[in-house]
């Protein structure tokens, strides 16, 4: 569960290392985001000469959460970190590589590019 002020790792090579959630998109008073939800983030830590710099405000999709994802068979898939992938205005990833596993819940029409770039889909 990701909410406002949550710090997330960035799971791509966009140049950002850490981002902070500043808004959960989708509804006027929506409080939590889970895997596959789009959030508005601010870049808090970035590498030199990356595509993004500290202070940039961007959209991101949540790809891993410590809280985990509940599957229809009752199993829960949990991760060691909260991670997101940065998106451009067209909801496409701005990076060319994705680091770490992502879940099958991202396999909708919107995020197939992220699933295809990921090294492992759980």
Curated annotation (Swiss-Prot):
List the Gene Ontology MF annotations in alphabetical order: large ribosomal subunit rRNA binding; structural constituent of ribosome
- InterPro entries (UniProt xref): Ribosomal_uL14, Ribosomal_uL14_bac-type, Ribosomal_uL14_CS, Ribosomal_uL14_sf
Record-linked Pfam families: Ribosomal_L14
Q: Which SUPFAM superfamilies match?
A: Ribosomal protein L14
Which biological processes are named by the entry's GO terms? translation
Q: Output the Gene Ontology cellular-component terms.
A: cytosolic large ribosomal subunit
Q: Which SMART domains match?
A: Ribosomal_L14 (SM01374)
Keywords of the record, alphabetical order, are: Ribonucleoprotein, Ribosomal protein, RNA-binding, rRNA-binding
Which family, according to UniProt?
Answer: Belongs to the universal ribosomal protein uL14 family.
Q: How does it assemble?
A: Part of the 50S ribosomal subunit. Forms a cluster with proteins L3 and L19. In the 70S ribosome, L14 and L19 interact and together make contacts with the 16S rRNA in bridges B5 and B8.
What the protein does comes down to: Binds to 23S rRNA. Forms part of two intersubunit bridges in the 70S ribosome.
What PANTHER family does the record tag this protein with? 50S/60S RIBOSOMAL PROTEIN L14/L23, LARGE RIBOSOMAL SUBUNIT PROTEIN UL14M
Tell me what this protein is called.
Large ribosomal subunit protein uL14
Q: State the species of origin.
A: Psychrobacter sp. (strain PRwf-1)
Name of the coding gene? rplN
């Amino acid at each position: 569960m990701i909410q406002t002020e949550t710090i997330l790792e960035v799971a791509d090579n966009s140049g950002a290392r850490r981002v902070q959630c500043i808004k959960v998109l989708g509804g006027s008073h929506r409080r939590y985001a889970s895997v596959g939800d789009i959030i508005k983030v601010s870049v808090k830590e970035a590498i030199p000469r990356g595509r993004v710099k500290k202070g940039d405000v961007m959209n991101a999709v949540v790809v891993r959460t410590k809280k985990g994802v509940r599957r229809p068979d009752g199993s829960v898939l949990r991760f060691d970190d909260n991670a997101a992938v940065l998106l451009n205005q067209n909801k496409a990833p701005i990076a060319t590589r994705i680091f770490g596993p992502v879940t099958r819940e991202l396999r909708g029409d919107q995020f197939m590019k992220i699933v295809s770039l990921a090294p492992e889909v759980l």
